[in-house]
Structures are given as structure tokens and as C-alpha cells.
Amino acid sequence: MILSTGAELRVTGPTSRYALVCTNGGQARETEGTWSASVEWLVGRLAPRLPDVGFAEVRYRVKSWRRLDSCFADARAAVSEVDAPRMLLLGFSMGGAVSIATADERGVEGVVGLAPWIPDELDVGSLRGKSLTVFHGALDRWLPGVPGVSPRHSRKGFERARAAGAAGRYVVIPGAVHGIALRSPWGGLVTLPRADRWADLVEAELRRWAETPPGAG
């Protein structure tokens, strides 16, 4: 599906009650958006387990943190298109910043950040009265050619969100790195260490959220 901004959206499962809108990471170079390997693997694993939840994946027009405003607009267009009664946003890496910036949209109850990048200049006031749950690999870090995000960085952003009025939980995953899966040269998905643990944590968070009445935390 092509969104109003020109970005793409693909949806797995029904969105009549619950939806998880998922955003990808990015890089410095301004390049055409791609589907997130980590999110794609996660959706493939969780959609059969959570048949009442719709999973909406966003493919940015340009996946670069130098074009954050463009990514924000793509995510807002996706939330508007999905328009489920209850929504969570899931952001991987740079997608954490995108999801947080979009959390003030109607129907959005919170954000799940997977190794989220939360820059100091990002306004986290959008999370006031909402939830921020962060899952981060203990071995994640910035390496040459690999734009990782350290747990210390995301923890700092998480604490800023808490101070701004967000409820939340922060979980470090021992043995995990930056992400859940990679796309192989032939197009298949190759899992990274502790992929199953990431999936189990996100599944438990979605079940907890769906079972909690709106506004009850």
C-alpha cells in the first residue's frame, strides 16, 4: 500500500481492534527506504501467535537520520492509514526516535523501542501519560561501519521520557547485539543472537497491553 507521503505500508493481520505500527532504522547516507529485516522476522514470528493484533510495517521514502522529518511524516501517515482503535508503535534503532515523535497521534497508547536511538534533542513530551518499553541488547554498541546504539544511550532517553511523564520498563537482553535479523544477499533472513528472546519479550508486552484496559497503564 502506498501512503499519502509516498512511503509504503504492509499489514499482516486484522486492525479492527489492535495494531502495532513498526518503523525501521536508518543511516547517515540518504538512501531509499527498505523493509526492516528485524521487524519482518519479528512479524513473521508473532503474527500467528497474536491473531487479534494487526502488524503494520512502514517502509520510509528515505531511511536517513538526516531526513528525520521525512521519516516522521511517513510514520504519521501510516498511523492515520491504520487508524485502529488501539495502537502501539514499535521502533527499531532510528525507528525508536520516529515512533516517539509520532506517539502523540490519536489512538497511540505507547511505544516499544528495540535498541532505540533517542537523541538528546528529541522531544519526548509526546509520551506523557503513555508507555515506553525498551528492549536492548547488552552487546550493542557503535562499531566501524555498523551504526549500533549503546544501552547507555537508550537508557538516558528512557529516563528522560520517564521524567516527562511516561510509564515504562527497561530490559537488557544478555548476549544480544544490535537487531534481531539481517537480510542475506539472496533475500532470506538470518537471525542474530537471542532472536527468540527478543520475540518472547515483545510478545509478552503485546499480550500485557491488549489485556490492559485503555488508560489503565
Regions found by a protein language model. Give the residues of each.
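Short beta-strand/loop motif that positions the catalytic acidic residue
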Residues: R128, T133-D140
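Short, surface-exposed "cap/lid" segments of acyl-processing enzymes
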Residues: I2-D52
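Active-site-adjacent alpha-helix of alpha/beta-hydrolase-fold enzymes
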Residues: T34-R45, R141-G168
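A conserved short beta-strand
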Residues: G107-I118
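Alpha/beta-hydrolase active-site loop
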Residues: S64-D83, W198
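Gly/Ala-rich beta-loop-alpha elbow adjacent to hydrolase catalytic centers
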Residues: L90-S99
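C-terminal catalytic histidine-bearing segment of alpha/beta-hydrolase fold enzymes
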Residues: R162-G217
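Cap/lid segment of the alpha/beta-hydrolase catalytic domain
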Residues: R29-T34, V53-S70, L182
